[in-house]
């Protein structure tokens, strides 16, 4: 685990159940955003930026997202893949009809099925890799039991993300100005205790 304590929206404390509804989309940092990544929505907006800078490496960010799912689990996950998003999502993607609706109590297995539908290898999706590190998801999609076949919904020419590398720096080889900017952004976005 990389994170043990989370700031989250307070109304969850009074909820009888949490139902996580998401769209199946490509994502620049995570390869795909689906059930696991969508739970990041429970983090307040101002804190999201702080977490993005604190966990700027894609695998660290994915591990934090898995920590969040374990700390504040939803009881049901629903993926709207009637129309998904392909290309450079989530901001520069394009709508793509897929034609299915998926649901599960297990977000990690659900994400693996969704990755299979869009032809994205699980190894390219940090949240799936992070879940597999903790044995929350099987290594092979064939180990997942489903009520109806998902294979008819495979989109063979789905356009996946072109670049899922770390957006702040690439393997530590960023230009000097990029490293300096990264340090400034980290300092500005990180919370520090203070005396009032």
Language-model features: where?
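Extended, low-polarity segments enriched in aliphatic/aromatic residues
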Residues: 1-196
């Amino acid at each position: 685990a990389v994170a043990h304590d989370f700031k989250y929206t307070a109304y969850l404390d009074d909820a009888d159940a949490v139902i996580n509804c998401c769209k199946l989309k490509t994502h620049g940092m995570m390869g795909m955003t689906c059930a696991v990544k969508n739970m990041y929505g429970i983090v307040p907006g101002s804190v999201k930026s702080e977490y993005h800078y604190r966990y700027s490496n894609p695998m660290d960010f994915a591990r934090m997202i898995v920590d969040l799912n374990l700390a504040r689990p939803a009881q049901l996950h629903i993926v709207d893949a009637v129309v998904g998003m392909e290309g450079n999502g989530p901001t520069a993607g394009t709508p793509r009809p897929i034609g299915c609706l998926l649901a599960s109590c297990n977000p990690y297995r659900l994400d693996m099925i969704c990755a299979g539908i869009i032809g994205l290898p699980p190894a390219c999706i940090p949240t799936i890799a992070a879940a597999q590190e903790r044995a929350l998801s099987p290594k092979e999609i064939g180990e997942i039991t489903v009520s109806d076949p998902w294979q008819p919904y495979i989109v063979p020419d789905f356009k996946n993300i072109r670049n899922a590398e770390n957006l702040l720096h690439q393997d530590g080889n960023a230009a000097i100005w990029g490293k300096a900017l990264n340090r400034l952004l980290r300092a500005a976005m990180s919370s520090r205790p203070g005396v009032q």
